Amino acid sequence: TTLERNADIVHMATYAPLFAHVEGWQWRPDLIWFDNLRSVKSVSYYVQQMYAKNMGTNVVPATLATPTPKGEDGLFTSAVFDKNTGEYIVKVINTTDKAQTVNIKFDGLKKIEGNAATVTLDCSDYTLDNTLDHPNAIIPQDGWAAVEGNVIKTTVQGKNFVIFKVK
């Protein structure tokens, strides 16, 4: 989220290391794991993919109104507008283990009603990981959230990354 909010300064970023063989690796932040016949995308791969598919064209201000100092509650956010699709895209990450209530307000916009499309990456179950035998244990899931009076009132579960899209 910080990288996205500073897109006027940071023009490119890369993720390393990218690949790891399941029988010969040095550390575990790799994006793609493989053996001689198969490959599997890591949870980190899906985080990068979700950002890449929801870049938008303009960064817009986004703040979280919380009773604790910025970042101490484990919630992080960024927002963009995509002039090609007419969508506002808000990304929220909850790094804690507990669910947290989030109210996303779209101040200054025309009336938004209906539903926001969502994409959620749920990493709350520490026993799960994408493996060659279970490559889809943790993958992004599409959903929706109600928008009432230009506000999305929702709960973001612990260890979740959620993208909200409204027109």
Predicted regions and their residues:
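Short, well-ordered beta-strand segments enriched in hydrophobic/aromatic residues
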Residues: 86-95
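Aromatic/acidic polysaccharide-binding cleft in carbohydrate-active enzymes
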Residues: 1-78, 84-85
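C-terminal beta-sandwich/jelly-roll accessory domains of carbohydrate-active enzymes
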Residues: 67-70, 94-167
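Short, ordered coil/turn segments that flank beta-strands lining enzyme active or ligand-binding pockets
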Residues: 83-84, 157
